[in-house]
Amino acid sequence: MLTMDDIVREGHPALREVASEVTFPLSDEEKKLGHDMLEFLINSQDEELAEKYGLRGGVGIAAPQLAVTKRILAIHVHDEKDRLYSYVLYNPKIRSHSVQQACLSGGEGCLSVDREVPGYVVRSERVTIDAFDENGIPLKLRFKDYPAIVVQHEIDHLNGIMFYDHINKENPSYLPPDVDVFG
């Protein structure tokens, strides 16, 4: 079982590397990593387990956060209608994105960042993702609003980008016009 001790923190070189694509069929180790990542997210959202194991709540995690520079991510997040988006994605890529932008009212956080970073992280409000499941079956997934923000945050990790790289350095509280704010 993964714990917070397994997650690397900002400053670790794996967080700034562009992760390599996985090849299919996946190794048992790559499949286990995906399962463990999703299990971590589920456990971190269970109050009892989170307290017992000292887990910070998370809705997404990428392999580089575990010092594994492979294009693997997991998300476990509900949208505003309580629909669950629970996936392990291999080699995910953004196929398309909306012109409309969105951000979270309180900014973003990250399991690899042990400090609050004020500022808006403006992202696409809707994205379509191409990825593969653990069996190499192609997936085309659409996300909007909060789940779209989460999956973009995790794909950024696969590209060596941290969420705070998107914050306006001169004015972190600057919000461009016509950006939808969630939360």
From Swiss-Prot:
Keyword tags: Hydrolase, Iron, Metal-binding, Protein biosynthesis
GO MF annotation terms: metal ion binding; peptide deformylase activity
Catalytic activity: N-terminal N-formyl-L-methionyl-[peptide] + H2O = N-terminal L-methionyl-[peptide] + formate
Residues engaged in binding Fe cation: C110, H153, H157
Gene Ontology terms: biological process: co-translational protein modification; translation
Pfam families linked: Pep_deformylase (PF01327)
Active site: residue positions: E154
Names of the cofactor(s): Fe(2+)
Cofactor note: Binds 1 Fe(2+) ion.
Taxonomic superkingdom: Bacteria
Enzyme Commission code: 3.5.1.88
Function: Removes the formyl group from the N-terminal Met of newly synthesized proteins. Requires at least a dipeptide for an efficient rate of reaction. N-terminal L-methionine is a prerequisite for activity but the enzyme has broad specificity at other positions.
Family, per entry: Belongs to the polypeptide deformylase family.
Protein name per the record: Peptide deformylase
